[in-house]
Amino acid sequence: MNQARIWTVVKPTVGLPLLLGSVTVIAILVHFAVLSHTTWFSKYWNGKAAAIESSVNVG
């Protein structure tokens, strides 16, 4: 671990909860942004089937 000396400045009892808390907050913000800016994601989470909007011709 190349950042081991960070724990001489910040106690692990303070630093680890801050690190994990910030990761949690970022994950929640990303999920909120995806849910509020797309129409398909909330339908996907509710179990609705995807609508096929166009067909693909191969060959």
UniProtKB/Swiss-Prot annotation:
Species assigned in the record: Rhodopseudomonas palustris (strain ATCC BAA-98 / CGA009)
Annotated Pfam families: LHC
Highest taxon of source: Bacteria
Topology within the bilayer: Single-pass type II membrane protein
Periplasmic side: 36-59
GO-annotated molecular function: bacteriochlorophyll binding; electron transporter, transferring electrons within the cyclic electron transport pathway of photosynthesis activity; metal ion binding
Cytoplasmic compartment segments: 1-11
Protein name: Light-harvesting protein B-800-850 alpha chain A
Quaternary state and interactors: The core complex is formed by different alpha and beta chains, binding bacteriochlorophyll molecules, and arranged most probably in tetrameric structures disposed around the reaction center. The non-pigmented gamma chains may constitute additional components.
Transmembrane segments: 12-35
InterPro entries: Antenna_a/b, Antenna_alpha, Antenna_alpha_CS, Light-harvesting_complex
GO cellular component, one term: plasma membrane
Disulfides per UniProt: none
Subcellular locations according to the entry: Cell inner membrane
Chain residues that bind a bacteriochlorophyll: 31
Gene (name only): pucAA
Protein's job: Antenna complexes are light-harvesting systems, which transfer the excitation energy to the reaction centers.
Similarity section: Belongs to the antenna complex alpha subunit family.
Keywords: Antenna complex, Bacteriochlorophyll, Cell inner membrane, Cell membrane, Chlorophyll, Chromophore, Light-harvesting polypeptide, Magnesium, Membrane, Metal-binding, Transmembrane, Transmembrane helix
A GO BP annotation: photosynthesis, light reaction
